[in-house]
Structure formats: structure tokens, C-alpha cells
Amino acid sequence: FVSFFSNNNLQFYSFMSLQSVVACRSVKDFSDPVLDLIERTYTESFPEVERRDFSLVRNLVRDESRFIVYALSKEDRYVGFITGWLFDGYTYVEHFAIDPAARNGGIGAEAMKQFLVFCGTPVVLEVEMPTDEMSKRRIGFYERLGFKLDNQVYHQPPYREGGEWLEMRLMTYGDVDLEYSFEQVKNCLHKNVYGVKDGLTR
């Protein structure tokens, strides 16, 4: 494979295997045209209660240095995206989706496997409760990549004012022991990702 990666800047890197090539480009300009493609995938892949308005995503690209967006492509064709946050000691993956037109080809697993290799930090993400076949499959997808499901009760704050808190679960990759750091990680996500004021977390 060929790659360029800086853990501080997360600028650009390409993931290669014998079967596929997935390129990941860091999006730094809130007016970058690829954000139009990402917006489409974002709104198609996640229900409204699990995402913010995309205009706010663009604002984060412009204003928040800890917020990261990657456009995924294969053979110069857009196939999906990853968004996340850089925190002390770990990276939080907020949203990860493959465009519907590019699914079922192993691109998602390939991209995430290589992202984990090059990320250089432990990773935390949220998943829906395993209450149906789709949510169970999603958890299984991450478990096959080496993630561990934490069974402590976690609530995702609402993205929109007046919305409901959603019971979810956290999954971790690498050296993140939620048995000891659950409250710290939860409070960090609630405060920085969702804007929950101190003392109002669940």
C-alpha cells in the first residue's frame, strides 16, 4: 500500500489491498463540492434523530478544529464518508456510511480496517441497541473489525432542541477501558459533540 498520514492533521491517505483501493481525503473547506455528495449519503443513511442538520456539519468543518470529515473514494469515484472528533487519547467516530450505490462490495470493512490502522489512537463510537436484525448486523460488523461492545447504559443526547434522548451503546477499539472511563468518555461526548451543559447528562 501507499499512504501519507499525520495523526495531528489527518490530511490525506490511501488504503490499498490486493482486492481494492480506498482513498480517504480530509475535507477542510466547508464549501468543498464533495460535501454535497456527503450530505446526500448522510441524510439517506441516518434517521433525522441520529444526525444534525447538514448546515451545522459545514459550520463545524469551518470552525471546529477537532471535527474531522473524510471523503472516501474508490477508483476516483465517491463511495462514502467518515466524520469524527479528535479527543485526548481517542478518536470518536460520529458518522460512517457507504453510499447506497457502492454498498455490498466490502468497501466499508476495508475503509474502516485501514482507518483503524492509520488512526493511531483508540476509537469510540455509538451504535443502536441490538433490538432488530439490522442493528445486530451493524454491531457484528464492528465486532468483526475488533471493536468491543460495552453494555453500560448510554443515552445519546438529541441533535435537535426538544428531541428525545436515545438509549444506545458504546463500542470501543484499542486501549479504551470503559469499565473505568465510561463517565469521562460519556461526559466528553455529551459536552463537545452534542453541546449538553454540565450537570445535564444522563
What are these regions (language model features)?
Residues 119-131:
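Conserved GNAT acetyl-CoA-binding A-motif
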Residues 46-74:
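Active-site rim helix/loop that mediates acceptor-substrate recognition in acyltransferases
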Residues 17-56, 168, 180-200:
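Short amphipathic alpha-helix that is part of the acyltransferase structural core
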Residues 71, 77-85, 90-97:
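Conserved beta-strand in the GNAT
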Residues 129-152:
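Conserved active-site alpha-helix within GNAT-family acetyltransferase domains
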Residues 149-182:
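A contiguous, mid-protein "functional segment" used to position or interact
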Residues 98, 104-117:
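Conserved acetyl-CoA-binding loop-helix of GNAT-fold acetyltransferases
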